[in-house]
Amino acid sequence: MTAPSLNDIYVARERIAPHVPPTPLMRHPLLDAESGLSIWVKHENHNPTCAFKVRGGLNLVASLTPAERARGIVTASTGNHGQSIGLASRLHGVACTVFVPDGNNPDKNAAMRA
């Protein structure tokens, strides 16, 4: 695997832009006051899956060829990655199966099914 080029990053941004709004970056005055610093928080919890991993799944599924999409996607996850792949698969009409470990958090399992 090679490192992505700057162009690869721009292409990925275009693929995911229709599905993920810009993530809010906010100041929190109480954190500033308590720390004596200027604290900025990037609120990934405002994304469709409430996690930054949504971008990777959307980019991956959007980049599949028609033949790859027809075969579907299989992945393994305990939560965030599975949610990302599930959402992206649903948006692009691709069949998806996510394997989870025995005893996985039921709330995470439900979120991946949603």
Q: Can you name each region flagged by the protein language model?
A:
Residues 1-114:
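PLP-dependent amino-acid enzyme catalytic core
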